[in-house]
Amino acid sequence: MSSYDRRFADPNSYRQRSGAPVGSSQPMDPSAAPYNPRYTGGGGGYGPSPVMAGDNSGYNRYPSFQPPSGGFSVGRGGGRGGYGQYGDRNGGGNWGGGGGRGGSSKRELDSVSLPKQNFGNLVHFEKNFYVESPTVQAMTEQDVAMYRTERDISVEGRDVPKPMKMFQDANFPDNILEAIAKLGFTEPTPIQAQGWPMALKGRDLIGIAETGSGKTLAYLLPALVHVSAQPRLGQDDGPIVLILAPTRELAVQIQEESRKFGLRSGVRSTCIYGGAPKGPQIRDLRRGVEIVIATPGRLIDMLECQHTNLKRVTYLVLDEADRMLDMGFEPQIRKIVSQIRPDRQTLLWSATWPREVETLARQFLRDPYKAIIGSTDLKANQSINQVIEIVPTPEKYNRLLTLLKQLMDGSKILIFVETKRGCDQVTRQLRMDGWPALAIHGDKTQSERDRVLAEFKSGRSPIMTATDVAARGLDVKDIKCVVNYDFPNTLEDYIHRIGRTGRAGAKGMAFTFFTHDNAKFARELVKILQEAGQVVPPTLSALVRSSGSGYGGSGGGRNFRPRGGGRGGGFGDKRSRSTSNFVPHGGKRTW
């Protein structure tokens, strides 16, 4: 799209490019024919195009999505959850599965056969919306190189656009810019500055950035622009944007952001995940939503039962692709992508760049841009002060109490415990000792997990204990400190755990209780500390010397979790209900 092409200047010129299969339509007065979310006539099978609601400012002049008169209900998640550690029905050997009501096992999912789609005679759709603002145009090559160097941005691809220094450079609609301003952001994060122009140009994109880097808005705001330029949903149409996420926690958080910005843009969204009743999710899909955020297993359930389809999807996001492969979701991802038109725009996001993710990207993406923030190797955030303490297992709890007395001032503290049983035990004892602690793990019902997260986010219960279910994708602001009560099974999980603090440029602190049983991780842990500019305690160095070759053996390299492997577990094994969050506080309030 050339810089002089003003294709968004008026509704009529937009309508003629809308890709209607039966010629162009005459301009329609929205008041003349009320919008029906279940059916829209005219304009071919997809219904008429959105009509601009006023003269939007900005160089791109994006057409505003026209919501139905009288409003609509926003997608919502369900209540009671199932069992298992993760938010999908991913059991049967790789990771403990979270079944929920009406779910299937992972083995059953692998046997599901979705209908083969016919992608002949595809209707054209618009996906290039980017015009450089004068500020970006004025940047010299030296300016661009300096900006990227200062923010540790590296790029690959053909005709890579310059980064955006200010939110106004993206020329998002005014309502989106107002929402950004209310959140108090002063400038785009590095992944947003480079990712927005790439996404708005309509090209496929690979984004490599650590959690907490602002990547959700890096793909979500261009998605809203994309939706606004497409014809309205017609009867039985599926979504225009599909966002796949590995866990229900991450999916719910993406939905919160989508709802926050989508309401201002008149774009509907819903969240589809396991461990919650299907009824409300099915109603949202049948009502019609432009954006679906989903975990792979529950989405395949919905596709198999024909509660929705992906024929209208032209903007696909794979969030935390490395995590989805870790959890064994590759077969489900492939089945889902096979239902989507091949000329879609695809955005793949990952914290690391292992060979499996690279292979997936090579098969699913065409001529992509690549934006890397920092390194493709998993590294600890340098803004986090890491403190490693050698603590014998029997002394862990007393050491935790000492830390809490030093740290607790009402700020949020996240404590990671390796097992669900251990998580409940620590939480129960903390509450009996008067500390405001709540636990979250896979044996908690979905409604209880939602309640615990809400209490923790609001600060009403500033101490939360968790298993690794919360280690990836959990977006809680202002976590002062992370405590690794138990060292995790992989160094990858260690980095993701401590990454819950020190987000968005803030400083953070992480305490880790390290035992002699964890000695195999000592050598690589020292490397992580050194790479992040942290002090290596003499006791840890001594443990490395005493443990011989250390973790990784003679093969060399950092040994992270093998793809598709991991902890065993069943699916939907209905254990006795976890009651640690209901233990009364004992004694006096301790802070």
Swiss-Prot record:
Q: Name one GO molecular function term.
A: mRNA binding
Query: Cross-referenced InterPro entries, in alphabetical order?
Result: DEAD/DEAH_box_helicase_dom (IPR011545), Helicase_ATP-bd (IPR014001), Helicase_C-like (IPR001650), P-loop_NTPase (IPR027417), RNA-helicase_DEAD-box_CS (IPR000629), RNA_helicase_DEAD_Q_motif (IPR014014)
Q: Which residues bind ATP?
A: A209, E210, T211, G212, S213, G214, K215, T216
> Which Gene3D superfamilies did the record assign?
P-loop containing nucleotide triphosphate hydrolases
Q: Name one GO biological process term.
A: nuclear-transcribed mRNA catabolic process, nonsense-mediated decay
Query: Which EC numbers characterise this protein's activity in its record?
Result: 3.6.4.13
Coiled-coil portions? none
Source taxon at top rank: Eukaryota
Motif (DEAD box) spans which residues? 319-322
Catalytic activity entry? ATP + H2O = ADP + phosphate + H(+)
* Annotated family: Belongs to the DEAD box helicase family. DDX5/DBP2 subfamily.
- Record's function text: ATP-dependent RNA helicase involved nonsense-mediated mRNA decay and ribosome biogenesis through rRNA processing.
State the domain notes: The Q motif is unique to and characteristic of the DEAD box family of RNA helicases and controls ATP binding and hydrolysis.
Which protein is depicted?
A: DEAD-box ATP-dependent RNA helicase 30
